[in-house]
Amino acid sequence: MSRKASENVEYTLRSLSSLMGERRRKQPEPDAASAAGECSLLAAAESSTSLQSAGAGGGGVGDLERAARRQFQQDETPAFVYVVAVFSALGGFLFGYDTGVVSGAMLLLKRQLSLDALWQELLVSSTVGAAAVSALAGGALNGVFGRRAAILLASALFTAGSAVLAAANNKETLLAGRLVVGLGIGIASMTVPVYIAEVSPPNLRGRLVTINTLFITGGQFFASVVDGAFSYLQKDGWRYMLGLAAVPAVIQFFGFLFLPESPRWLIQKGQTQKARRILSQMRGNQTIDEEYDSIKNNIEEEEKEVGSAGPVICRMLSYPPTRRALIVGCGLQMFQQLSGINTIMYYSATILQMSGVEDDRLAIWLASVTAFTNFIFTLVGVWLVEKVGRRKLTFGSLAGTTVALIILALGFVLSAQVSPRITFKPIAPSGQNATCTRYSYCNECMLDPDCGFCYKMNKSTVIDSSCVPVNKASTNEAAWGRCENETKFKTEDIFWAYNFCPTPYSWTALLGLILYLVFFAPGMGPMPWTVNSEIYPLWARSTGNACSSGINWIFNVLVSLTFLHTAEYLTYYGAFFLYAGFAAVGLLFIYGCLPETKGKKLEEIESLFDNRLCTCGTSDSDEGRYIEYIRVKGSNYHLSDNDASDVE
């Protein structure tokens, strides 16, 4: 062992000895927990001393440092941190509920309000478009007014939008309500992860930020249950579905009236005493001097290094580490959407109908199964994030998602291969559209949104089938022919299908959807939000998260607005093969560019982006060393991820 390393070991051991002496003086009769803590430190010290005497390089120092780090990160975290995280994550719950509830509500709305494919896509994507705009604007809002004010505004928008949706009497009012809700979603989506990350201790940050995504998937699952429960109210069921979001929004609003601002934002704004008080409240019995000094010094150094001239986004783009972080953050959000997640969530009931599930209520309840899968496996992600790390979890998740998309596409290929042949071609009445009668198979007929499939059944075989125009006033019946009168044709054992073909392979779509969410939910669901809440320095955090959230919502709009038309032109299986291709490209991006941020302080992570972008995936290199100081109950000693001989 080098002389410098030996000196560092001795200094660290003296610090630990001082700590234990101080504990004994303050606590004459230590409890079991204190005794256990001292034993663990003594064990680490003895281990390190033996390694030192054996001349074991610098490994002893690293072992001692890691033991000390683990011990002092195990100080009790106050329950207040969890309360703050849960109330914050109600924004995620509303995000999930308002994006998930439309899946079931759309099946009732399109019948009651006679919505064509364009209006269905508008009601889904208008929320997403508004979210994109407000997410981009949310960066400035967070920077000027703070995280707390932004969350309060989002809660108010959720409440107002839900009230408008519940009272809507036409599709235009519905569109307005969806726009208002979208504004709330956008602000919440970029603010909540940042707020949770800034109030969380480093050893819990990944899990607490992932709780936000857990609440998003919980909101989607709850929305699917509400959809199923109110699907039996054919007339006004959708009003209850869309209006119930006001309840958690009101709870969050009043809860946040009593919750604090982010201490990091307060320090940035010069409100240091208030920041110290809040940070102390968040850390309980842990000392906050080093964390407070680290945040304060980091802000001062960043202001000197980057300067304050010009818009923050321009400063981010001109400063290489933040530019690289922005590329990684925006790339993760883009590939999350291009892998098709919100097509799956927004249109899950419609996809199940496309695969051959005939009954609306059955499709809605089956969609709730997929939402429950999403929720449960997001819980798995909460457990894995601090064990496996962000990088491995994200890569493995997207790899499985790619395979699941291929399986989903193959399910639709099977259904297309056994698509019933059209055997009866009626003559169109004078002046009526005859385009639908030109199709030869049910699958071709279903790809045309203006057509439906009219048929009889002989046991399990489709007979006397025809493709005829759908009634524009109601998709429950045809514009003309045998299926023109819904009441009449049902008494004659004639069946009408719109958006689906009779098939024995409808189960493959449900299997594909479940497999997709099993792989997507633990990693690609929460990790883009978790990583983005960590990788930017404080001066760029609001703007960086606003940009990445905006990218997420922009690609969300592109995917959700085009899904039905993409399925029409590329076929259903073609659309899912396309998403699988995008996911495969995302794998290359994650492998080359995503660094590991597990266990690092927010103020340390910037150094991960000091190197060239596509080498940052190899985060174990010796480049970009950093030194960390922690206070051990009044005594300072250094912790380094590198050999102590590297530290001057």
Swiss-Prot record:
SUPFAM superfamilies: MFS general substrate transporter (SSF103473). Residues 98-125, 170-178, 234-239, 346-363, 415-508, 571-573 are extracellular. GO terms for cellular component: apical plasma membrane; astrocyte end-foot; cell body; cell periphery; cell projection; cytoplasm; growth cone; intracellular membrane-bounded organelle. The modification Phosphoserine is found at S6, S47, S50, S640, S645. One of its GO terms (molecular function) is protease binding. Keywords: Cell membrane, Glycoprotein, Membrane, Phosphoprotein, Transmembrane, Transmembrane helix, Transport. It catalyses: myo-inositol(out) + H(+)(out) = myo-inositol(in) + H(+)(in). It holds the Pfam family Sugar_tr. GO terms for biological process: myo-inositol transport; positive regulation of amyloid-beta formation; transmembrane transport; transport across blood-brain barrier. Residues 1-76, 147-148, 200-212, 261-324, 385-393, 530-549, 595-648 are cytoplasmic. It is a multi-pass membrane protein. Glycans are attached at N433, N458, N485. The chain crosses the membrane at residues 77-97, 126-146, 149-169, 179-199, 213-233, 240-260, 325-345, 364-384, 394-414, 509-529, 550-570, 574-594. It is found in: Cell membrane. InterPro entries: MFS_dom, MFS_sugar_transport-like, MFS_trans_sf, Myo-inositol_Transporter, Sugar/inositol_transpt, Sugar_transporter_CS. Glycosylated. Predominantly expressed in the brain. H(+)-myo-inositol cotransporter. Can also transport related stereoisomers. This is Proton myo-inositol cotransporter. It comes from Homo sapiens (Human). The gene is SLC2A13.
